[in-house]
Amino acid sequence: MTDSHYIGRFAPSPSGELHFGSLIAALGSYLQARAQRGVWRVRIEDIDPPREVPGAAATILRQLEHYGLHWDGEVLWQSQRHEAYREALAWLHEQGLSYYCTCPRSRIQRLGGIYDGHCRTLCHGPENAAVRIKQQHPVMHFHDALRGDIQADPQLASEDFIIHRRDGLFAYNLAVVVDDHFQGVTEIVRGADLIEPTVRQLSLYKQFGWRAPGYVHLPLALNEQGAKLSKQNHAPALATGDPRPVLVQALRFLGQRDVVAWQEMSVEELLRFAVAHWRLTAVPTSANVNPAFSNASR
C-alpha cells in the first residue's frame, strides 16, 4: 500500500550477478522509496546484448527477492521498449534536434574525448552513422539531495553526445530518460559513478520538454585496491545464504542506525526496521572499501 506520489526505481544491466556495490544501490533506492510510502520499480536495462551474460537477468531478480527487496508492478525490460526509443529519436529528428555523425572513435580520441560538433552542419545520411543530440540546453549544474549542488564539466555538459550508436544500438542516456519518464520516476537513487552522465540526461529532459526527476548519488563500495566494485573487475556475487548479515553490513555502509538483535529478526522485519529508521542525511558521500561481511555478526 502506498499513499505517496514518490516513484523510485532500481535499473541493473544483466552483465552479471549483483554484488555488494549493486546491493548498496538497490537497498538505498528501496529504502528511500519505502520510507516515503512510495512505489519502487525494477527495470532490466538489457539494450546492449554484447555486454549481457545469459541468465543474468533472471538471477538478478532472484537475488532481489532473496534479499527481501520486492518491487511494485511488472518488471520493465528495455529490450521490449525499442519502439518507444525509435519514436523518441524520430521526434528529435523532426524537431531538428539531432543529426547523423560519421566521425570515427579515433578522431574523437585525438580531440581528447570530447566531440567538437564536426558533423553538425554536414547533413549526413543514416548509413554507417551514429545519431547525436544537437545540444540546445546544456546543464551546468544540478541539485543532488545528498550531495547538494554539483557542478558539471562545461565541455562535457555542452557536448553533442550520442543517442543512437553506429552499430544500431540505442544509447544508454536516451533509453534511461525515455523509460524514467514513461515509468513516472520522481527520484533516481543510484551510485556516484553515474554523476557524470546526469547532466546529459537532464539536458534530454529539457529537449523533450519533460519534467526531470530528483537525484541522489550514493557512495561507491570499493575493493581493497581502491577500485569500484563492479562486474568488470570481478566483484564477488552476493552470498546465496542468509541475507541478513549482508543487509546489516549494507545498512552500516549507508550510515544507518545499527540493528540491535538482528539475528532474532526475519528479513522482512529487518527491512521494516530499516525503512522506519531510514535517514538520507546519515548516508556518507565518500566512497569506502567494501567491509568484510563477517563483521556484521559483531
UniProtKB/Swiss-Prot annotation:
Residues annotated for Zn(2+) binding in this entry: C101, C103, Y115, C119
UniProt EC number: 6.1.1.-
Domain of life: Bacteria
Cofactor(s) of this protein: Zn(2+)
Gene Ontology molecular function: ATP binding; glutamate-tRNA ligase activity; zinc ion binding
Family the UniProt entry places it in: Belongs to the class-I aminoacyl-tRNA synthetase family. GluQ subfamily.
Record: residues binding L-glutamate: R9, F10, A11, P12, S13, E45, Y172, R190
Motif ('HIGH' region): 12-22
Organism: Salmonella typhi
UniProt keyword terms in alphabetical order: Aminoacyl-tRNA synthetase, ATP-binding, Ligase, Metal-binding, Nucleotide-binding, Zinc
Cited function: Catalyzes the tRNA-independent activation of glutamate in presence of ATP and the subsequent transfer of glutamate onto a tRNA(Asp). Glutamate is transferred on the 2-amino-5-(4,5-dihydroxy-2-cyclopenten-1-yl) moiety of the queuosine in the wobble position of the QUC anticodon.
Enzyme class: ligase
Binding-site residues for ATP, renumbered to this chain: K231
A GO biological process held by the record: glutamyl-tRNA aminoacylation
Protein's recorded name: Glutamyl-Q tRNA(Asp) synthetase
Record-linked Gene3D superfamilies: HUPs
Motif interval(s): 'KMSKS' region: 228-232
